[in-house]
């Protein structure tokens, strides 16, 4: 797979940015590790299995014993602890208990922060306009919420078959118009009118684009020589499709394609040889992105990408880190620790500054960021020349 070359060589760009970073670091004094909140402890069962205790807040205070809301839009950090779901404002530290939960599953919030996907494909809503749906037998291996409201979830089950569950009545429909294959990743266009998929067909992966009903499917990009696509995402304005390709040579590359001109794509960032990147996430506005690198838990590292440069989200953190998602255009929710150790949640300012400790010992966490100013159209190729070649780009 090839792409449009950048104006500055990738090695040159990384070198220049590295020098700039070092110069800035020298003028700002000796760096220090981020603050650490008091640890959450564990208690043992009769069989000796540790049971996580309730999480503690950054100031060391325990979570409240009651469970009352309502949640606020500013409470963009959601987490699970002590059998309950919580929402926290990362700036004011205002906390709300949302609801009891036994199986949080993916704990993935819809684009308006008013509904969440739980274990067993149950859906829990936070207000009268949001759905409460029981679980179903399907176990989504990959999924994405419908946009801009969250009226459906498109997913692929364990067998890789593409399906859609509707929030009005809970029904599930197969997207039979899509090409055959094993569906590995899915992304909903922010307008809600289109879908993108990574599909494996006989061991070869490709990126497909379709309407929100799975019709008019077009192959945009296909992998060559064993290239795998580990993540896909649309830009917040809906103009571009982004993806991470793990090349057979053993390095990741971040690419984008202009949906109005689908005859080419651009290489943005190349990871080091022998590395693996996934979990691509785009900030809700602006140009920032994040990925997670590493193939095993204790090697995880969250990276922030701007332009062609990637830097660690928490460069002075010794524990494994993982980007969980963007809280706003410049703040990233990052988890440090894990791997059989207590986790700690931080709000990381991509512009610099000390990471802000939020919670220690949460069982699970995710952003609850509200989608705003969503587009209402999908870019169409601006001419015949803007269409992808028959079969896609390789």
Predicted regions and their residues:
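N-terminal secretory signal peptides that target proteins for export/translocation
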Residues: 1-10
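Sec-dependent signal peptide recognition
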Residues: 11-18
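Enrichment for repetitive, rod-forming helical segments
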Residues: 18-21, 131
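C-terminal motif of bacterial Sec signal peptides marking the signal peptidase cleavage site
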Residues: 23-25
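Sequence signature of WD/YWTD-type beta-propeller architectures
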Residues: 28-394
């Amino acid at each position: 797979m090839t792409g449009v070359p950048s104006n500055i060589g990738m090695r040159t760009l990384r070198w220049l940015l590295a020098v700039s970073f070092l110069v800035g670091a020298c003028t700002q004094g000796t760096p220090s590790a981020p603050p650490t909140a008091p640890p959450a402890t564990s208690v043992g069962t009769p069989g000796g299995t540790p049971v996580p205790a309730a999480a503690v807040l950054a100031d060391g205070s325990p979570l409240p014993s009651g469970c009352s809301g309502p949640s606020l839009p500013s409470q963009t950090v959601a987490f699970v602890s002590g059998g309950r779901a919580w929402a926290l404002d990362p700036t004011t530290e205002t906390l709300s208990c949302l609801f009891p939960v036994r199986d949080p599953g993916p704990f993935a919030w819809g684009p308006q922060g008013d509904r969440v996907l739980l274990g067993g494909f149950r859906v829990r809503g936070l207000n009268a306009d949001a759905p409460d749906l029981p679980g179903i037998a399907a176990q989504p291996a990959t999924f994405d919420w419908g946009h801009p409201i969250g009226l459906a979830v498109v997913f692929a089950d364990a067998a890789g078959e593409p399906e859609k569950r509707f929030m009005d009545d809970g029904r599930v429909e197969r997207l039979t118009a899509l090409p055959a294959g094993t569906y590995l990743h899915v992304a909903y266009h922010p307008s809600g009118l289109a879908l993108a998929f990574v599909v494996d067909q006989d061991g070869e992966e490709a990126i497909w684009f379709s309407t929100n009903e799975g019709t008019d499917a077009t192959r945009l990009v296909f992998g060559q020589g064993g290239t795998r696509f580990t993540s896909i995402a649309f830009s917040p304005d809906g103009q571009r499709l982004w993806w991470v390709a793990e090349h057979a040579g053993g390095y990741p590359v971040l690419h984008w394609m202009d949906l109005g001109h689908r005859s080419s794509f651009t290489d943005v960032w190349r990871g080091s040889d022998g590395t693996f990147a996934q979990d691509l996430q785009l900030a809700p506005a602006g140009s920032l992105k994040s990925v997670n690198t590493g193939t095993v838990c204790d090697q995880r590292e969250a990276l922030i990408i701007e332009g062609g440069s990637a830097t660690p989200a928490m460069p002075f953190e010794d524990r494994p880190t993982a980007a969980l998602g963007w809280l706003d255009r410049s703040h990233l929710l990052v988890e440090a620790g894990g791997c059989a150790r207590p986790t700690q949640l931080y709000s990381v300012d991509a512009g610099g500054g000390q990471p802000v400790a939020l919670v220690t010992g949460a069982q699970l966490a995710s952003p609850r960021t509200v989608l705003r100013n969503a587009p209402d159209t999908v870019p169409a190729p601006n001419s015949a020349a803007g269409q992808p070649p028959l079969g896609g780009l390789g």
